[in-house]
A protein has these predicted regions:
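A short alpha-helical cap/connector motif
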Residues: 1-143, 150-171, 175-212
Length: 212
């Protein structure tokens, strides 16, 4: 059973229901719990950027179910989402992680090593868009996760989509912006960027979309 305090609560689901869902889901293992602890200890208020247990498990299951062997992540933070994706990859699978922070990704590197997935992950520190554009022509991905600066989402999406294999999957985090996408925050750049992207993807004939 996962202690409720270890979870990142949904902003849209009653706390009692959220706790019920946690009890009836596979809990995080010791490696994940330790990474959560270290992230809270080392990053302070920034720890809220870490995805929740339920999302991590869902990502691992999706990657495994689709038989993905090549994945990319834009925005790695302390490596919790990457740990989930790496665990779901098929034999010989590789995950490319892109992040701009040496400090936060040093936590990720140690966690991946401890969890036994470091050999599946390549970390490149630098602007994500530059990293993607520097990849060899024709390099494709089965799965992509975008969780970086919101004003850059549209460019990340386009760059990743051109490298996504037919039937591949792109996950974008924070696409509801805490519900503010339907609110009135005209001066918030992040919300405006996500609204723009949501509208663009919803009308993009190249993809099928679900926003949850």
């Amino acid at each position: 059973m996962t202690p409720p305090a270890a979870r990142r609560r949904s902003q849209f689901i009653d706390a009692v229901i959220d706790d019920y869902a946690a009890v009836h889901s596979t809990p995080p293992d010791p490696h994940q719990l330790e990474l959560q602890r270290i992230t809270r200890e080392k990053t302070g208020g920034a720890a809220g950027m870490q995805i929740g247990d339920d999302q991590a498990m869902l990502m691992e299951m999706l990657v495994r179910a689709m038989g993905a062997t090549r994945a990319v992540e834009i925005g790695t933070f302390t490596g919790y989402s990457a740990l989930a994706v790496a665990r779901g990859l098929g034999p010989g699978g590789r995950l490319l992680c892109c992040d701009i922070s040496q400090e936060w990704t040093s936590i990720a590197r140690a966690a991946w090593q401890e969890a036994g997935v470091a050999n599946r992950i390549e970390l490149r520190v630098g602007p994500g868009l530059e990293t993607l554009r520097a990849l060899p022509p024709g390099e494709q991905f089965d799965f992509a996760f975008i969780d970086a600066d919101k004003t850059g989402y549209a460019q990340y999406y386009e760059e990743v989509l051109t490298r996504l294999r037919p039937g591949g999957l792109i996950l974008l985090d924070n696409t509801l912006q805490g519900g503010h996408v339907v609110g009135d925050l005209p001066d918030d750049e992040d919300v405006a960027a996500i609204r723009f992207l949501n509208d663009a993807i919803a009308s993009d004939p190249r993809v099928k979309v679900v926003l949850i």
